[in-house]
Amino acid sequence: MPEFEEWHNSLTNDEQDALDVRLELVSLRGPVLGRPYVDRVHQSRHHNMKEIRLPNGIRVLFAFDFRRSAVLLIGGNKSERDGSSPNWNRWYERVIPIADQILDRHITQLRNEEK
């Protein structure tokens, strides 16, 4: 997804390496991978949306599509400051609707390709 790629390119080499390790775990374990590496995103309208959890508040929202492929939707840092302290809930409130739209678009595209 272009939204994810743009964000991924902004990461430091160390952050990209840490993410690559988590992505390898997702690839090996699939949907059963859980905490501390992955957790479910309950606020999404997609029951299968999850987040890859990296140190320092870095998160990647993703989902497995109906082909069982992991779709990386959007990433960011939930610890970014909003005033004097991090506001984790605000980050989720902002990015989950975007991730929902990206996943909707992806699913629609896959269904159109099947026709």
Give, region by region, the residue ranges found by the protein language model.
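Alpha-helix initiation/capping motif
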Residues: 1-2, 36, 65, 77
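Arg/Lys-rich, positively charged N-terminal/basic patches that mediate binding to nucleic acids
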Residues: 1-22, 87, 103-104, 108-115
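Residue-level signal for well-ordered alpha-helical segments
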Residues: 3, 18, 29-31, 39, ...
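Generic alpha-helix detector with strongest preference for long hydrophobic helices that associate
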Residues: 3-7, 22, 26, 30-33, ...
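Residues in flexible loops and secondary-structure boundaries
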Residues: 16-19, 27, 34, 46-49, ...
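A short, surface-exposed loop/turn module that caps and links secondary-structure elements
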Residues: 25-54, 113-115
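Enriched for short, Lys/Arg-rich terminal
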Residues: 57-59, 64-115
